[in-house]
A protein has these predicted regions:
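Small-residue-enriched flexible segments
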Residues: 1-41, 45-51, 58-327, 331-343, ...
Length: 377
């Protein structure tokens, strides 16, 4: 399987880049499209559709290829996978029946392939991404191979989209179903944040709404451990969410990051980026330093050494929170990941990352870099 990545600031630039990269006889069959919500999605999809290319796409909080990181632009990974080795499924969930929709997708995938694996992207801030994962597990078991992310909208947190040929939705899912007998897909989710303090107990929560930890309002604890001062609704900013990160402990595998997204100032509770069950164990996180990047790259080196030594292409779902917290250093992380396999890469800064925790279960992650490695068998 051959892969090439292209990028551009407009549909016309994508048209030119596509023509240039197909000039040597390269005939891509699948495009992994990451683009700003400000871009003309219909025009970009028409260019690819007219070229006979199947589309898996999502809007982003920033996008990148090996050429560098951009905001407000378009990044595309072109693959010439045999069309018999994949199919694309697209569904909406207006009734919030997330689990049932992915159960249906899993059943459809089994009609096509005996051993399917999945590259997924979901849209809508109200989508229960964990329910999406559970739906696949219901049909295919706990070991199902899934990687992906949730769409963004340039940090507006209002409306994001997933897309395919002639379709896009702000409330749905797009899935590339791969034949795992023909295509090897491996993923590695790594965050690298260091824990601080003792293990604590969530004493009151409902879903993703955390009220108290060790019977103390959760905002008060995060102010303490984050070293914040004079925190008020007026001076609280998105960047403070970087401080409000908890490591949710799991019985099996690595912890899972949960970031604070919204504060309820009436009771100092916090709405988090995913479920935090009452009674669960958590630790707070230190603000990131440079070895966060080193840990992510080391995780990829271990993946290469132990599971997939060669690759045809890389896709990276990197949390938007990592971009906020690491700033320009994020380019070093992306470059370091690409250099492990030295193949074309494209990726997005996502609202959430969907992947198996290292030595653990499928999870919805936050502040995590989810590297997806593809290799034709």
């Amino acid at each position: 399987m051959k892969a090439k990545s292209i990028c551009g600031t407009s549909p016309s630039e994508i048209q030119s880049a596509l023509q240039q990269n197909m000039g040597d006889g390269f005939k891509p069959t699948l495009a992994v499209v990451f683009l700003s919500v400000k871009q003309d999605r219909v025009a970009v999809c028409k260019i690819l559709d007219d070229a006979g290319i199947a589309i898996y796409g999502a809007t982003t909080n920033g996008e990148f290829t090996g050429e560098g990181v951009s905001a407000g632009e378009i990044a595309i990974l072109l693959l010439d996978i045999n069309p018999a080795y994949f199919t694309i499924l697209f569904e909406e969930f207006p009734d919030k029946n997330f689990r049932q929709i992915t159960q249906f997708i899993a059943k459809k995938a089994l009609e096509k392939f005996a051993h399917p694996c999945f590259l997924i992207a979901g849209s809508n801030l109200n989508t229960d991404a964990e329910a999406l994962l559970h739906g696949f597990e219901d049909i295919l078991g706990k070991e199902v191979n899934i990687n992906g992310g949730m769409a963004g909208d340039d940090f507006a947190f209002k409306e994001n989209f997933v897309l395919t040929n002639k379709k896009s939705t702000n409330n749905g899912i797009v899935v590339v179903v791969l034949d795992e007998d023909k295509i090897n897909m491996k993923g590695r989710a790594t965050f690298g944040w260091k824990p601080v303090g003792t293990v604590k107990t969530v004493t009151k929560s409902e879903g993703n709404h955390v009220y108290t930890i060790d019977d103390t309002p959760v905002l008060d604890l995060t102010i303490k451990y984050g070293g914040l001062e004079n925190v008020t609704p007026e001076n609280f900013a998105l960047e403070h969410c970087i401080t409000l990160t908890m490591q949710l402990q799991r019985e099996n595998g690595d912890p899972v990051m949960r970031a604070g997204l919204v504060v309820d100032w009436n009771d100092h509770s916090i709405y988090c980026s995913g479920h935090v069950p009452q009674g669960s164990k958590v630790r707070f996180s230190l603000p990131p330093d440079f070895d966060v990047i080193e840990k992510v790259i080391k995780g990829c080196e271990e993946l290469k050494a132990n599971e997939i030594p060669e690759a045809d292409a890389l896709i990276l779902f990197n949390c938007a929170g990592r971009l906020l917290s690491l700033g320009p250093l994020i380019s070093e992380e992306i470059n370091g990941i690409q250099e492990v396999w030295n193949v074309p890469i494209a990726g997005m800064f996502s609202n959430a990352e969907l992947a198996r925790a290292t030595k653990g279960n499928l999870e919805m992650h936050g502040f995590t870099a989810c590297t997806v490695v593809l290799k034709e068998k």
